[in-house]
Amino acid sequence: MSRPSTPLLDKAPTPDRLRALPEQDLPQLAEELRTELIDAVSTTGGHLGAGLGVVELTVALHHVFNTPYDRIIWDVGHQAYPHKILTGRRDRIRTLRQAGGLSGFTKRAESEYDPFGAAHSSTSISAGLGMAVASELSGEKRNVIAVIGDGSMSAGMAYEAMNNAGALDARLIVILNDNDMSIAPPTGAMSAYLARLVSGRTYRSVREAAKQVAQKLPKFLQDKARKSEEYARAFFTGGTLFEELGFYYVGPIDGHNLDHLLPVLKNVRDTQKGPVLIHVVTQKGKGYAPAEAAADKYHGVNKFDVITGKQAKPPANAPSYTKIFGTSLIEEARHDDKIVAVTAAMPTGTGLDLFGEAFPKRVFDVGIAEQHAVTFAAGLASEGYKPFCAIYSTFLQRGYDQVVHDVSIQNLPVRFPIDRAGLVGADGPTHAGSFDTGFLAALPGFVVMAASDEAELRHMVRTAAEYDEGPISFRYPRGDGVGVDLPERGSVLEIGKGRIVREGTKVALLSFGTRLQECLAAAEELGAAGLSTTVADARFAKPLDHDLIRRLAREHEVLVMVEEGAVGGFSSHVLQFLATDGLLDRGLKVRALMLPDIYQDHGKPDAMYAEAGLDRTGIVRTVFAALHRDELGHEALPTPFRA
């Protein structure tokens, strides 16, 4: 299929070339950029809706500001694909999120036009403020622009940064990309005129002069003058909250109208004083009918047909782990009216949309606010409820202090379903669930579980629902299950007890999580090589099954631990127990397989696990090496002594 014709975009491969174009050409450039974006993402998959919504804004920013000297920071980075196309990466845009290709987010190592990496939300204003202060300290006249969506503004970190920026009176431009307004975008000449007026140098100079005069008045008159001015501006614009934080507010303006965007951005650029917030109203999926009609379904997409918008979905061999969690929790909630669910702006991603349909009054979406979500759940637990605080592994990191201080120290029975455990493929290191086992198993009294398949996940949901002695977590990966038979309802597992899945005599493979299937495949291959192999499912990283570990250590020559986590997790706890229990004293050969001590780049999960040695081949190779055998399983001949 031929690529779309983009004659203007072809002339603007970098921002300096873009800035050479006359303003009257920019609307056509934006349309070509939108066409290129749709065509590229249709072949790669990725985040489409957010990028379509900021096409005109991206063109305007790079036309008005002197990037990369001026810094543009994209919060989260979902919307940065148009930015990548315009900043010298168009020739690689069809490698998005592929192994060895472009990242799906901004990335410092990828381009000088990406001054700050992003993927988690609400960091842009803090980073931008740091850059703005650094520029001032260095005597630079650099503009720093943070582009943040209204969803990211639900996180407290954004307001902490704005409060600090206002107090410092820093030269920082924040663009609030509001794509979720319940009213239509502002239209007409009056709206555009007001935005130009309040962003202009004359208005702001008069306003500053009036402030200086007002400071000489009695305080009660100062307050009245300030409130009158705020009321008058808020009548047209509505920026009182941001003004209270010390920002000069401009907007709202139509983010798809370059005739409105360009003069406002120029005015703000040319006025070198204090922090400014520009409120821009956009539409997710703008310019592509299927995405406009169903913005939620086109936030993140698989490959799709550009004409019909139909997404390609590979056939599922089994329900996803996320769906199994959601349906299992519904089943438990039918038996226990104390069960409630908490999510931090990810009801669909965590499967709690299903729970919400069944129990709308027992699910709470707190927004992008993981810290609040954890302590909110702790409050529910303190009153006798059974909160399931479902958060992706990577996002639980944001609420770790609350996990320690508000949940663990008080031993409150908050349940933590941890989705996206292990590698997540195309989203790369920013979204990998590598660290939760380590940072949760370090906490006294915390029960830490990992499901090896979808049936085990159902058992762990039931176990967590029944467990009231303290905090408990269970982790499970992204993607489909392995296709095992599912019980109608899970069983309650004995805390701290694993299970033997396959009996052997020489080699023991102890798995924590869904690498169990690879361990079973490795056991078959090892058996064919004459190495009788036991496979065990640990189930618990804390408390460990000491009896199971003793048996594996005493009855086998080789013990290999296998997990989908970073250094310091399950294997570390097993090794500590082996050492303190004296089980290493008799010459047991112990090996630990885990994620490498690097941030693995994006790629296909299977290939990434193979790279880490966490597939069947890697496990077999590890056992052979421990027994001094070659890759065919033959005993290696001793190296002859040479004088």
From Swiss-Prot:
Reaction it catalyzes: D-glyceraldehyde 3-phosphate + pyruvate + H(+) = 1-deoxy-D-xylulose 5-phosphate + CO2
Short name of any one Pfam family annotated for the protein: DXP_synthase_N
Keyword Transmembrane: no
SMART domains given in the database record: Transket_pyr (SM00861)
Binding positions (Mg(2+)): D150, N179
Entry keyword set: Isoprene biosynthesis, Magnesium, Metal-binding, Thiamine biosynthesis, Thiamine pyrophosphate, Transferase
Cofactor binding note: Binds 1 Mg(2+) ion per subunit. Binds 1 thiamine pyrophosphate per subunit.
Cofactor(s) essential for the protein: Mg(2+); thiamine diphosphate
EC number from the UniProt entry: 2.2.1.7
One BP term from GO: 1-deoxy-D-xylulose 5-phosphate biosynthetic process
Pathway(s) served: Metabolic intermediate biosynthesis; 1-deoxy-D-xylulose 5-phosphate biosynthesis; 1-deoxy-D-xylulose 5-phosphate from D-glyceraldehyde 3-phosphate and pyruvate: step 1/1
Ligand binding (thiamine diphosphate): H78, A119, H120, S121, G151, S152, N179, Y288, E370
HAMAP family: DXP_synth
Family note: Belongs to the transketolase family. DXPS subfamily.
Name of the protein: 1-deoxy-D-xylulose-5-phosphate synthase
Source organism per UniProt: Brucella abortus (strain S19)
Lineage, uppermost ranks: Bacteria, Pseudomonadati, Pseudomonadota, Alphaproteobacteria, Hyphomicrobiales
